[in-house]
Amino acid sequence: MRILHTGDIHLGDLAGPTKDGENLRRLDTIGCMKAIVEDAQSIKPEVSIIAGDLFNRSRVWADTALDDVNDALEKFVIPLCGCSDEVVLLFGTMNHDNPRAFELIKKATENLSNLHIYTTPAVEKLDTKEGPVQIMAVPGFDKARLRLFYPGMDKEQENRNATALINDTILGLATQLDHSIPAVMTAHYTVNGSEADNGSTFLAGQDVVILPSTIDAAGVDLACFGHIHKPQRLASETPAYYCGSVNQLNFNDEGTEHGFWLHTLQPMMGGNAVASGFIGLPEREHLTLRLSPDTVAQFVADPQSVSFGELVRDKIIRVRYSCTAEQEKALNRADIQKALTADGAFYVAEIVPEDVEELDSKDQLTEHDGPFEALGRWLEHNDITGDKADRLKALAEPIIKKADDGRDDGKHTGAFIPHKIEVKNYRSYTEAEFDFGPVRMAMANGQNGVGKSSLFMDAIA
């Protein structure tokens, strides 16, 4: 039994150029959708799973929403139904998938008996030409609903409560499974220990997570996840995978191949073996260019002489450059953008300095330097020496003396170091004091509204 596993389509407008009123990044996404359909028409899978986040934005204008729903149906969902025995469409997160959009899809596809749309947790048996298969569907939900029952809860505890709820839900659904029939879980959540597209690892408390032990305890043969945009095999005994997004969505996806999984369930003694293969898609690549001070100097001297060649062609580019302070002043960033565009860059997202070298340390002022020292350093930095420097110092001397006669020297300069504060807190109307004497590092904790911030604000005021 072959199972096509995709998700995180994010159909909609993305940051990028437009042509004839059409967002070209949206067309990139549609191109990836069509590529999946073409592969599916060749493979003819028994089950195709769309594991959530079919759309990119939940809240959009009516005309945009209708265009997204129409393209999702005409160019993706309906064609998949035409070449798959069964198609599973899972609701993702509330900020991407709109419940009303899914209601519209349900009404528009009432005649498609092989399309199964899940907006609530469920277990369902589907019949394919290779035999029956059970689908355990665990769509995303809005954890903000829990705030009605636990007002004032902090984010970490909210995540832990939602985590407990989701894992208990999965274990409850597992009791409905018939273990004589292959079972596939599809869910749109973070799995504990999974790797995000930026390389960080999700742990319990940071998000609503499904535990690998819960996946194993569910007793399914395969778990097909959406939500994390980096394709990966998860750390559970049960074969479990993130399909990843179909296209690169931002620079966190740079260098990561995107596509979809094709899983094959093969009956064997004591269960089902799973063989999985990853199929790439024609994604739009992101590329970060880092320019050295030498390259920046070349742009300053002769912008026309700089070329990036095929490196940037058809890619979304961001530029990070390092240079001196003088080069930063002389650099025209538009010259960099022109060079990238001339070499075929699809879109230049940003051009920003990564490191601008300031004056040498010997030229830096300190809190011990007075006006005369500052003037001397300025003259030295600007190569003003000899008689001209002496003349400027002589002209400046009476002005500096008049501005600073030394009477308040040292009284209003230096670091602000609090020793002790005594205030009447306007939030709680209580007397409060705090001694900083023995403190090197401190954290002010407490529930919202007790006056943590005002303790210090009142003291400053």
What are these regions (language model features)?
Residues 191-269:
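Conserved beta-sheet core of the metallophosphoesterase superfamily
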Residues 19-127, 212-220, 228:
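Core catalytic region of metal-dependent phosphoesterases/phosphodiesterases
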Residues 10-15, 56-59, 88-102, 142-146, ...:
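Active-site environment of divalent metal-dependent phosphoester hydrolases
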Residues 408-430:
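N-terminal pre-Walker A segment at the start of P-loop NTPase domains
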Residues 438-461:
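Phosphate-binding glycine-rich loops of NTP-binding sites
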Residues 1-4, 11, 16, 123-137, ...:
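Beta-strand-turn-beta hairpins that frame and shape the catalytic cleft
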Residues 100-208, 243:
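Conserved catalytic scaffold of divalent metal-dependent phosphoesterases
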Residues 265-416:
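Accessory, non-catalytic peripheral segments of nucleic-acid enzymes
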